């Protein structure tokens, strides 16, 4: 007999999610383009590679952010024993946003030193703000819905995660607001937040 979605184990959805995270994080490097021969012949290969620093910066920030998301996503699934339809859809929305990250990453890399850099930075910070909101909603549903958490889930750990994740949307909102004032501050906040949540995930 096939199990109902609300009674199913989390293995399939976690495996699918891992694949999506892996693909999204791999696609980031495709936006770092190999210098064209015409440019190399003019300024040299070293200078051409160094001129790609906006792409390196955008790649590093997005890679760190997606990696930390994946770690925290795994953390959620280590505490969840069952899923329901709402959990499926919140997780699906999260994955949709994650797969979109390579686009604002490429946009930021292309326009980081362009007069339209603030627009690119706002799109970049905006996607992570949206991810933070959905991530919180996914966890809130898992933590409060009846019977989704595993019996072994420690209540103190659940409460600690809830408090930790609660700050995410507000902090990314700061990064989004800063994008209209200073591109560098906005991107810097996004990078620092990736480090912050990486450290907190081990707390």
From Swiss-Prot:
Question: Could you tell me which InterPro entries the record lists for this protein?
Answer: TMEM175-like
Q: What highest taxon heads this organism's lineage?
A: Bacteria
Q: Which GO terms describe its molecular function?
A: identical protein binding; potassium channel activity; proton channel activity
Write out the topological domains of type Extracellular: 32-52, 111-117, 182-183
GO term, biological process aspect, one:
potassium ion transmembrane transport
| Positions marked as site (Hydrophobic filter residue 3) | 30
The reaction(s) catalysed by this protein are:
K(+)(in) = K(+)(out)
Chain ranges for the short sequence motif RxxxFSD motif as given in the UniProt record:
12-18
Question: Where is the site described as Hydrophobic filter residue 2 found in this chain?
Answer: 27
Topological region Cytoplasmic: 1-7, 79-84, 143-154, 200-203
- Region Short helix H1: what ranges? 37-42
Complex and partners = Homotetramer.
Q: PANTHER family recorded for this chain?
A: ENDOSOMAL/LYSOSOMAL POTASSIUM CHANNEL TMEM175, ENDOSOMAL_LYSOSOMAL PROTON CHANNEL TMEM175
Known function: Potassium channel. The channel is permeable for K(+), Rb(+) and Cs(+), while it is unable to conduct Na(+).
Per its record, how is this protein called by name? Answer: Potassium channel Cha6605_3372
User: In which organism is this protein found?
Assistant: Chamaesiphon minutus (strain ATCC 27169 / PCC 6605)
Organism classification: Bacteria, Bacillati, Cyanobacteriota, Cyanophyceae, Gomontiellales
């Amino acid at each position: 007999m096939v199990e109902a979605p609300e009674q199913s184990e989390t293995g399939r959805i976690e495996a699918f999610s891992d694949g999506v995270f892996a693909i999204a994080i791999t696609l980031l490097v495709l936006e770092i383009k190999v210098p064209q021969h015409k440019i190399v012949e003019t300024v040299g290969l070293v200078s051409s590679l160094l001129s790609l620093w906006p792409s390196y910066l955008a790649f590093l920030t997005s890679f760190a952010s997606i990696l930390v998301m994946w770690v925290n996503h795994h953390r959620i699934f280590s505490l969840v024993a069952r899923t329901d339809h709402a959990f499926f859809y919140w997780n699906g929305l999260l994955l949709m946003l994650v797969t979109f990250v390579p686009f604002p990453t490429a946009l930021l890399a292309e326009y980081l030193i362009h007069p339209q850099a603030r627009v690119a930075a706002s799109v970049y910070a905006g996607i992570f703000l949206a991810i933070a909101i959905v991530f919180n909603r996914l966890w809130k549903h898992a933590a409060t819905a009846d019977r989704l958490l595993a019996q072994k889930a420690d209540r103190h750990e659940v409460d600690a995660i809830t408090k930790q994740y609660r700050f995410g949307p507000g902090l990314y909102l700061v990064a989004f607001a800063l994008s209209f004032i200073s591109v560098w501050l906005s991107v810097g906040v996004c990078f620092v937040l990736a480090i912050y949540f990486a450290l907190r995930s081990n707390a």
